[in-house]
Amino acid sequence: MSKVYDWFEERLEIQAIADDITSKYVPPHVNIFYCIGGITFTCFLVQVATGFAMTFYYRPTVAEAFASVQYIMTDVNFGWLIRSIHRWSASMMVLMMVLHVFRVYLTGGFKRPRELTWVTGVIMAVCTVSFGVTGYSLPWDQVGYWAVKIVTGVPDAIPGVGGFIVELLRGGVGVGQATLTRFYSLHTFVLPLLTAVFMLMHFLMIRKQGISGPL
């Protein structure tokens, strides 16, 4: 085992990386509230894992979406548990995200030189809310359908481009299969990818600049 480790150590300098991670200075004013961002990240990982598991059985069509969700809940082994964890973790992620934003704002963590860290955080907050909006529609039940109809109809109030935005979101004039396909693609591919990219940027900047000092 030692020879294997030495082989990797010689090429990748694993010990230096481990020492850098474990020896990072933590300011004395840091308390439990500074862990909320990490909890949000953990919820995101749970969402990815449980969401990926459900993609094996979910069918993103207006004719089969609701039935496929019922199948996950009643026939798939532990399907009810996986979907329930996905739903609970989603609520927890939104709550932790809001608390994290408040903590950073109230402790002045958005000030110079951490403006870009704040910007990436705000973008991830928008992505988190978008996860909720797009995921809410996927069962394609009465609640999901009318929620989509209302949400996608909001931009219609924007002068000039409102109608175009509505048709872009819905994939047509009305809510239908094209809308569900768009929301499914956003929920399972576009938003996770965007969130992962900005999350990496967020972490790298925190790693570079460190945790902000006390007020």
Swiss-Prot record:
GO terms for biological process: photosynthesis; respiratory electron transport chain. SUPFAM superfamilies: Transmembrane di-heme cytochromes. One of its GO terms (molecular function) is metal ion binding. The keyword Flavoprotein does not apply. PROSITE patterns: CYTB_NTER. It comes from the Eukaryota. It is a multi-pass membrane protein. Heme c binds at C35, R207, I211. The chain crosses the membrane at residues 32-52, 90-110, 116-136, 186-206. Heme b 2 binds at R83, H86, H187. The N-terminus is blocked. Pfam families: Cytochrome_B. Heme b 1 binds at G37, H100, R103, R114, H202, S212. InterPro entries: Cyt_b/b6_N (IPR005797), Cyt_B6_PetB (IPR023530), Cytb/b6-like_sf (IPR027387), Cytochrome_b_N_euk/bac (IPR048259), Di-haem_cyt_TM (IPR016174). It is found in: Plastid, Chloroplast thylakoid membrane. Binds 2 heme b groups non-covalently with two histidine residues as axial ligands. Binds one heme group covalently by a single cysteine link with no axial amino acid ligand; this heme was named heme ci. GO terms for cellular component: chloroplast thylakoid membrane; membrane. Belongs to the cytochrome b family. PetB subfamily. PANTHER family: CYTOCHROME B (PTHR19271:SF16). Component of the cytochrome b6-f complex, which mediates electron transfer between photosystem II (PSII) and photosystem I (PSI), cyclic electron flow around PSI, and state transitions. Creation by mutagenesis of a Pro residue at position 204 (a codon that is known to be RNA edited to a Leu codon in tobacco and maize) leads to assembly defective mutants, indicating that the Leu-204 is essential for proper assembly of the cytochrome b6-f complex. This is probably due to lack of assembly of apocytochrome b6 with one of its heme groups. This is Cytochrome b6.
